């Protein structure tokens, strides 16, 4: 008979099952994104997942690690999925391949693999692509109700691999809405228009007519919110990070909007547009690169929320989730150091 030593804990959940649950929780948001922006989103996800699995398998083989066993943890699958849904649906195929390979090989495996990476791999891949190819990374189609030329599955496939539809239209022509005006994401559109128009006039534009967060985008964010609530219910993630993230972002947006409503976006636009809910529930909560203490998670999430608001308002990019997460990842060792819970019976030491 063997006697086990303490601590006596029991957890039936494996890394594989948690990763799979997170992947399943992404489905509502992916469905909404596919409905409003076409099949390109699904194609990007498929390309990213295939690249992630192949890149991870190749590195594991070179490191003489058990390839099939390690691939079964589903972490590469999740990294590819998160990066795939973050890219514009009709971005060239080589971009998603390059970004995913960089995320897996450099941002994850170079540090030792799962559990060793200090930065979120998917966001590292995204930022590398955004800095290297800013035009392609901001070339989103208009949402379905505003599309001048709806794009089917075959045209999406052709555009991703050749740059043109079967009728010869390129991405710039597909970006033109039904009103003949080239469309952008709500955050990008708001940021650009604010240079010459007041907020009230901007919110009268077609992309905002179905809601303050922009046509389609509020439904995508609601989809990821639903998936995030599922993760909280199943206790796959801690509540501290998403709650503090959203409260900090909403607080900054609300204060600025109340002080200068003609110059700042309303809180609803910040909360339900861009990658807000995806970032709050699926990216910032990465257990490897996030803070590990309860107070640390609150600080970590709030820091991301504040940084997202600062980048969106004062930065050069319309959405700042990826940069905010990576900047907060840098602060994790410091946050964890100063938020370690005090051991019962011991006083906090001073050095």
From Swiss-Prot:
Membrane topology note: Multi-pass membrane protein
GO terms, biological process: electron transport chain; transmembrane transport
GO cellular component, one term: plasma membrane
Compartment annotation: Cell inner membrane
Cofactor: FMN
FMN phosphoryl threonine PTM positions: 185
Transmembrane stretches, start-end: 18-38, 42-62, 87-107, 121-141, 212-232, 241-261, 264-284, 298-318, 320-340
Residues spanning the signal sequence: none
Disulfides per UniProt: none
Pfam families per the UniProt record, alphabetical: NQR2_RnfD_RnfE
EC number: 7.-.-.-
Keywords: Cell inner membrane, Cell membrane, Electron transport, Flavoprotein, FMN, Membrane, Phosphoprotein, Translocase, Transmembrane, Transmembrane helix, Transport
InterPro entries: NqrB/RnfD (IPR004338), RnfD_bac (IPR011303)
Superkingdom field: Bacteria
Keyword Zinc: no
UniProt similarity note: Belongs to the NqrB/RnfD family.
Assembly: The complex is composed of six subunits: RnfA, RnfB, RnfC, RnfD, RnfE and RnfG.
Purpose of the protein: Part of a membrane-bound complex that couples electron transfer with translocation of ions across the membrane.
NCBIfam families (UniProt xref): PRK00816.1, rnfD
Protein name: Ion-translocating oxidoreductase complex subunit D
Source organism: Yersinia enterocolitica serotype O:8 / biotype 1B (strain NCTC 13174 / 8081)
Lineage, highest ranks first: Bacteria, Pseudomonadati, Pseudomonadota, Gammaproteobacteria, Enterobacterales
